[in-house]
Amino acid sequence: MPYFATAGTGLIDAGNGKDTLSGITPLWSLNDNHNQINSQQLTIMARRKNADHGAMLHDGDGYMTAWFAYTLTADRDAAKAFTGSRPEILENSLWQDVHIK
């Protein structure tokens, strides 16, 4: 199944980086979850810089919309955000810790 996980780097999402109980979606957890997925389809995780949990509804909307357009309707323009030799999300300086497999 396709998989796209997003989170922010703010304290509510990321936690303090030291306490494993801190944060809703700390980087270690995102990495662990993404690494455990065994899928033949596209899987992506990414964190939006300087955003926190509440902001991700609008800060992540463009990529989430493109993700659904690509995975549900095979929209070729939307696919460019995630596929090809230079996926747009990898070039976007507002995002970090982007992993595509």
Please name every model-derived segment.
Residues D59-K101:
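Catalytic active-site module of serine/aspartate enzymes centered on a nucleophile-bearing elbow/loop
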Residues M1-R76:
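Active-site-adjacent alpha-helix of alpha/beta-hydrolase-fold enzymes
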